[in-house]
Amino acid sequence: MTGVQTCALPISPLEYFRGKARLERSLADTGISHAILRPTVLFGKEDILINNIAWALRRLPVFGVFGTGKYRLQPIYVDDLAALAVEQGGKHDNVTINATGPETFTYRDLVKCIGQSIGKKKPMISIPPSIGYLAAWFLGKCVGDVMITRDEIKGLMSDLLYVDSPPTGTTRLTDWITEHADTLGRTYTSELARRIDRNKGY
């Protein structure tokens, strides 16, 4: 069983998605029974993306959005993904499943939802991807992290985190954000630190 992002394309111009496609192909070539789960954005305890959007909203006077911000995401709760993995682990069918949550957001609407829930609604401005990358690079230096890569920006803006299929998760991100509004974004969560220190919690 393997977990990969929603879009794994062998001919993608983005190395990340080509790598995921190679992984899927290698797994299929083994001949063993397998389930390939393709989650989009994850949320849950010690979340990175949702938490760090909230962190930025708590501290910055405005929030920059790459381009129009109309590209879509289907966040899935980490416990829903885990339950799906356990369920498929007990089966012997070869399947590929798009693991998505019950809600679809544009990126702009996601930021707006988080801001409203934590009481930090901020003006959103559209910025060119190149400027957004430089701004994220500078902020990343301040917090000792790589906040986003150029390929991640391209994948996000290409709508690669959206797929037209029924949701597999049942937990709504809007409900989860409301339940955790008091603590969300109080501290920055470093993905780089977690990769370096494997003892850090996820």
Residue ranges of model-derived segments:
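Short, small-residue-biased leader/transition segments that mark boundaries at the very start
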Residues: T2-L9
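Oxidoreductase cofactor-interface core, primarily capturing Rossmann-like NAD(P)-dependent enzymes
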Residues: I11-K120
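Low-complexity, charge- and small-residue-enriched intrinsically disordered regions
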Residues: P61-I76, L139-L160
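Mid/C-terminal beta-alpha module of Rossmann-like enzyme folds, strongest
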Residues: A85-T149, D159-Y202
